[in-house]
Amino acid sequence: MLSGVLIFNQKGENLIFRAFRNDCRPRLADVFRIQVISNAQVRSPILTLGSTTFSHVKHENIYLVAITKSNANAALVFEFLYRLIQLGKGYFGKFDEEAVKNNFVLVYELLDGN
């Protein structure tokens, strides 16, 4: 089960933070930014730090990140992230930083399932 979803721009600015569980704190966004975005040598789409796993994909000029605290099925996590990209493209025509910023309320509604 996902604990949260983050969307960052290329500079590491947090565009979207949606926590689904109480174990997902905003400071986890800083951890991801320091470990992945500011470190160009990171190549793996999965990063585990302690009991927290960050699964991420880069699309256009944004990073989509799923945070899990339990042993989640990685294939399902990435399926969710790629479907979120497709959903964003369907709604906005493209799914990039500008689209997320201009439609952040709708992005939150889509993440909430409303």
Residue ranges and their predicted role:
Residues 1-114:
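Acidic, low-complexity cytosolic segments
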